């Protein structure tokens, strides 16, 4: 990935065939050829610059291998980062689906960070609350999510195992015709959801793993699945490995303040043009929080992300 300017396409002229990156594992990429079939590809040069969802130009170097010579311009690039490194998730997305469950208890910090990541790129977020048949913790989960519902985020409640047909009917309108990435902690039901929406997903995953030479590491790579053709609208669903943290060290102060939708209308109310919304007098954000119009949890997340963005980054 090009550090500092993620999403920048290669500028050199290139000839070759066109395809779509449908899986990534390290510096190995599986490209779906526009003309049919698949090819394992490697990036040209030392730096890996491809992401699942990228449209690329490649040149075949063998019957089943090739080299990516150009990445087409991206609409967006979703990735996470910490103080030491960054991790590409996917490119050219319409939607970020955040999978939560009533049990085990979900991380509200990860949820908030995923929403900020989506907002910073102008990507629509969708929150799924799975396992609503486990009623012991359902009301607690709903209470924790009330803040996000009040902010205008769409929350779909379902139980993939207990009522698969109802879950399918609830999800299809949200995913059909869109490029979505599915993210979340382990144990929230992502695998069950994939099996519900993508017929034969296990066989597809094994095939992708074999073509990538990733062997037994079938849960450690990001992969793209086309939604069923009989839906009639196209669309794709990208599955990313489960993770427990979602660092956003790459987001600048200006990007962060605009990634909180409840902050945006109040940014012009600050007394100082360079207000950081931490302790400055006459701050529109702090004033709104004092009036109960901004939840302190959201401001706490903003302050933490701002602190992280100030850390020195070697990448």
From Swiss-Prot:
The keyword Cell wall biogenesis/degradation does not apply. One of its GO terms (molecular function) is GTP binding. It is found in: Cytoplasm. Its cofactor is Zn(2+). GO terms for cellular component: cytoplasm. It holds the Pfam family RsgA_GTPase. Zn(2+) binds at residues 270, 275, 277, 283. Keywords: Cytoplasm, GTP-binding, Hydrolase, Metal-binding, Nucleotide-binding, Ribosome biogenesis, RNA-binding, rRNA-binding, Zinc. PROSITE patterns: ENGC_GTPASE (PS50936), G_CP (PS51721). Binds 1 zinc ion per subunit. It comes from the Bacteria. Its EC number is 3.6.1.-. Monomer. Associates with 30S ribosomal subunit, binds 16S rRNA. Belongs to the TRAFAC class YlqF/YawG GTPase family. RsgA subfamily. One of several proteins that assist in the late maturation steps of the functional core of the 30S ribosomal subunit. Helps release RbfA from mature subunits. May play a role in the assembly of ribosomal proteins into the subunit. Circularly permuted GTPase that catalyzes slow GTP hydrolysis, GTPase activity is stimulated by the 30S ribosomal subunit. This is Small ribosomal subunit biogenesis GTPase RsgA. It comes from Ralstonia pickettii (strain 12J). The gene is rsgA.
């Amino acid at each position: 990935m090009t550090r500092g300017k993620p999403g920048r396409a290669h500028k050199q002229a290139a000839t070759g065939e066109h395809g779509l990156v449908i899986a990534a594992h390290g510096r190995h990429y599986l490209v779906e050829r526009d003309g049919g079939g698949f090819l394992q590809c490697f990036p040209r040069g030392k730096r890996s610059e491809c992401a699942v969802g990228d449209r690329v130009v490649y040149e075949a170097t063998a019957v089943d291998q090739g080299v990516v010579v150009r990445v087409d311009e991206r609409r967006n690039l979703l990735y996470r980062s910490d103080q030491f490194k960054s991790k590409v998730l996917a490119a050219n997305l319409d939607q970020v689906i955040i999978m939560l469950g009533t049990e085990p208890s979900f991380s509200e910090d990860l949820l908030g960070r995923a929403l900020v990541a989506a907002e910073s790129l102008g990507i629509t977020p969708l929150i799924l609350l799975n396992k609503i048949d486990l009623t012991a913790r359902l009301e607690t989960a709903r209470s924790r999510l009330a803040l996000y519902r009040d902010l205008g985020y769409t929350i779909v409640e379902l139980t993939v195992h207990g009522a698969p047909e109802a879950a399918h009917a609830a999800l299809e309108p949200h995913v059909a015709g869109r490029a979505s990435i599915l993210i979340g902690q382990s144990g929230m039901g992502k695998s069950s959801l994939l099996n519900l929406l993508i017929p034969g997903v296990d066989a597809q995953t094994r095939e992708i793993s074999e073509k990538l030479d990733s062997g037994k590491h079938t849960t450690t790579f990001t992969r793209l699945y086309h939604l069923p053709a009989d839906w009639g609208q196209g669309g794709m669903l990208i599955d990313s490995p489960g993770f427990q943290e979602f660092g956003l060290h790459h987001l600048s102060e200006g990007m962060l303040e605009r990634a909180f939708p409840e902050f945006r209308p109040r940014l012009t109310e600050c007394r100082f043009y360079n207000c950081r919304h931490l302790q400055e007098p006459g701050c529109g954000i702090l004033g709104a929080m004092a009036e109960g119009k901004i939840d302190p949890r959201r401001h706490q997340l903003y302050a933490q992300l701002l602190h992280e963005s100030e850390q020195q980054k070697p990448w």
